[in-house]
Curated annotation (Swiss-Prot):
Region described as Disordered: 62-108
Top-level division of the source organism's lineage: Eukaryota
Low complexity: compositionally biased ranges: 68-84
Name the record gives this protein: Large ribosomal subunit protein P2A
Gene designation per UniProt: RPP2A
Pfam families to which the protein is assigned, alphabetical: Ribosomal_60s
GO biological process: cytoplasmic translational elongation; protein heterooligomerization; protein homooligomerization
Organism: Candida albicans (Yeast)
UniProt key word Protease: no
Length: 108
């Protein structure tokens, strides 16, 4: 991530096609240890592409990642079935909370 951040920083500063040396210079200026192979991979994969293309490519990859929505839907179904129990538990909890202070008010 730090390599991509350095790359994007350089592009934002006006360098349309940062080189590996440019990325290394930015990271070194921030006292970040540089791994040559990661910098080279970033430069080779971004060669010939502009930042908008890279962002669009990343969005496509992220959209294919499962988000876990089915688990939330299953939880919603069980909550709908047990709605009355939830309301009773909430009322009971509120009653317990009022007894917790044992009639000792903080600002009395």
């Amino acid at each position: 991530m730090k390599y991509l951040a350095a790359y994007l920083l350089l592009v934002n500063a006006g360098n349309a096609t940062p080189s590996a040396a440019d990325v290394k210079a930015v990271l070194s200026a921030a006292d970040i240890e540089v791994e040559e192979e990661k910098v080279e991979k970033l430069i080779s994969e971004s060669d010939g592409k502009n930042v908008e293309e890279l962002i669009a490519e990343g969005n496509e990859k992220l959209s294919s990642v499962p988000s876990g929505a089915p688990a939330a839907a299953a939880g919603g179904a069980s909550a709908a079935a047990g709605g009355e129990a939830t309301e009773e538990a909430a009322e009971e909890e509120a009653a317990e909370e009022s007894d917790d202070d044992m009639s000792f008010g903080l600002f009395d």
